Regions:
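Conserved N-terminal beta-strand and adjoining loop/helix that marks the start
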Residues: 66-77
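Hydrophobic beta-strand-centered segment that forms part of the acyl-chain substrate-binding groove
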Residues: 80-129, 143-147
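Generic structural detector for well-ordered beta-strands
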Residues: 50-54, 104, 150
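HotDog/MaoC-like acyl-thioester-processing domains
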Residues: 2-8, 12-47, 109-111, 121-176
Length: 176
């Protein structure tokens, strides 16, 4: 076999392998569609936070990069905690550390669109809070993306979990 024939044979083999791999992904995608959540309505959330997009939030595809959404979750939750006076990010003895986050995407958003984050609390534990966050185009009826964000509250110095302070507990209960 010539070098050109070897190269052509290898390319066909790689293409066959690619097709098989893609077929496996397609099968997984079909199963995933069954369990895929739908966009959430505004009524699912208890509080709304206005958010600004930045030029650097867009990626090469012309929409907000997926990692930006997790940053928006973090900003929205912490902005509300600070505004409510239940989190002192500079001097408070108790701080929230993110231990889990995730997101489902439904439609594209891009700079310079104004956004809103809808906030709700899904679960309150002894030392943790599970938030649900929806990202909306400003005024939209359904989420463009929604996800979860879990804080474990810890002592600032020791970084050991502590029970939720009373004021924080009252605030997050109002978001359930």
């Amino acid at each position: 076999m010539t070098a050109a024939a070897d190269s052509d044979h290898a390319a066909r083999g790689a293409a066959d392998g690619d097709r098989q791999a893609l077929a496996g992904i397609a099968d997984r995608d079909d199963r995933a569609k069954i369990d895929r959540p739908s966009p959430a309505p505004r009524s699912r959330y208890r509080r709304f936070v206005p958010l600004a997009t930045r030029w650097t939030d867009n990626d090469a595809y012309g929409h907000l990069n997926n990692v930006v959404y997790l940053s928006l979750f973090d900003s929205a939750v912490n902005a509300e905690l600070v505004a409510a006076g239940v989190l002192d990010i500079e001097h408070g003895e108790v701080i929230g550390l993110v231990v889990e986050t995730g997101c489902h995407f439904f439609s594209s958003l891009a700079f310079p669109q104004p956004l809103e984050a809808g906030l709700a609390v899904a679960r309150i534990g002894r030392t943790s809070v599970s938030y649900e966050i929806g990202i909306f185009a400003a005024g939209a009826a359904e989420t463009a993306a929604h996800g979860r964000f879990v804080h474990v509250y810890v002592d600032r110095k020791t970084r050991r979990p502590v029970p939720l302070p009373d004021r924080l507990l009252a605030f997050v209960k109002a978001l359930q």
